[in-house]
Amino acid sequence: MHQFTLAEIARGLADKSFSSEELTRALLARIKQLDPQINSFISVTEDLALGQARAADARRAAGETGALLGAPIAHKDLFCTNGVRTSCGSKMLDNFKAPYDATVVAKLAEAGMVTLGKTNMDEFAMGSANESSHYGAVKNPWNLEHVPGGSSGGSAAAVAARLLPATTGTDTGGSIRQPAALTNLTGLKPTYGRVSRWGMIAYASSLDQGGPLARTAEDCALLLQGMAGFDAKDSTSIEEPVPDYSANLNASLQGLRIGLPKEYFGAGLDPRIAELVQASVKELEKLGAVVKEISLPNMQHAIPAYYVIAPAEASSNLSRFDGVRFGYRCEEPKDLTDLYKRSRGEGFGVEVQRRIMVGTYALSAGYYDAYYVKAQQIRRLIKNDFMAAFNDVDLILGPTTPNPAWKLGAKSSDPVAAYLEDVYTINANLAGLPGLSMPAGFVDGLPVGVQLLAPYFQEGRLLNVAHRYQQVTDWHTRAPNGF
């Protein structure tokens, strides 16, 4: 059963080939057996899962239907889950049990999904390798000496290892799409405001967005259907009708205009990845797409702008973790200042402390205009570049990452080298656009992804193109040895 996609599970549950409880028990056993090799879970919620599975079976027996009813899910460990540890991969929240469900968790539970656990992640979602977690690094199932990408590395590794068919992730600068590329998955970052952020512990509030990780575009469509929608509890949620994401998966690509930004194919891109991207372009041309070169002239400014804006927002968001109301508290503080200083110094890891310091500096009185205001101006230029490009093309295509997965620890001492791995993904977050990564081949036995970007609220078109591509290629069907 572990080889089934989410769509296959939906069909199997509907025709009563197996029950949700049988499926849940099989996957829980598989997690217990295999997860110690990859460390993709922080918490496994066995009792919760079995209770939800029995409830889903009862709902189905009573005549209820639904693609997600009784299907398994695991949540990135920054989605609050009622009564379950929600740690953000940090010592700071190691003892925090959320008193409520995040909107995403609640919506998927209402749809009947079964929560198998909470997945490992870079601490407070800050990282590109899933090495900064308090609970240890996650390993890439394709090569256990390599990283799975981040920050949703646990969510990606769990699906790649066939521990379950789909997981939730979040994407602030590429944290769904980059691990999807490095583990041979399909990962979708929706339009900013498409999926509620209520109960999703914040890193950078103007950039964070939740989305699905799965093996196929068809599965991402099913999961996004359950996640998307307006939420009055989230002030950044957008009141836009949610289409049927599965309805147009098979639509023709005849005449679809795809733009290849010339800036995506310059220095820094592994030439073998460039070849795989061009091969995927040829497949889409065979399906009827028309491809042309375009320009995104301000792309080179994206990383510096992002690494001012995101840490600035993080320094503000993470100021709430002070050892007073919840989270880690240091032993025997001498006074209030000592409580704050030691609780934060001991509770946060090195990368989180680095970004808090950078953000605080960028927001300080003497530097606010020089850094934060300037970064927001660059953000506007990047958005304008995309708007101009989408006057000429329907979608933008390029590599998801400049390199395949690197070895564990290879970039730990050089944070900027790791930051540069997000060079192709950050732009979509700065502009708030939807983006999808899909499997496109292998380099040295390690997966490579191709990224598609679309105008606002065109997730359906991204899923359509990825699905048609996956009907004529088999990269997404390949599984790592031993899993």
Swiss-Prot record:
EC number: 6.3.5.7
Protein name: Glutamyl-tRNA(Gln) amidotransferase subunit A
Assembly information from the UniProt record: Heterotrimer of A, B and C subunits.
The entry's keywords: ATP-binding, Ligase, Nucleotide-binding, Protein biosynthesis
GO BP terms, alphabetized: translation
Gene name for this UniProt entry: gatA
Active-site residue list: K76 (charge relay system), S151 (charge relay system), S175 (acyl-ester intermediate)
Substrates-to-products reaction catalysed: L-glutamyl-tRNA(Gln) + L-glutamine + ATP + H2O = L-glutaminyl-tRNA(Gln) + L-glutamate + ADP + phosphate + H(+)
Molecular function GO labels: ATP binding; glutaminyl-tRNA synthase (glutamine-hydrolyzing) activity
Gene Ontology CC annotations of this record: glutamyl-tRNA(Gln) amidotransferase complex
Keyword hit for ATP-binding: yes
InterPro entries in alphabetical order: Amidase (IPR000120), Amidase_CS (IPR020556), Amidase_dom (IPR023631), AS_sf (IPR036928), GatA (IPR004412)
Entry's transmembrane regions: none
Protein function: Allows the formation of correctly charged Gln-tRNA(Gln) through the transamidation of misacylated Glu-tRNA(Gln) in organisms which lack glutaminyl-tRNA synthetase. The reaction takes place in the presence of glutamine and ATP through an activated gamma-phospho-Glu-tRNA(Gln).
Family listed: Belongs to the amidase family. GatA subfamily.
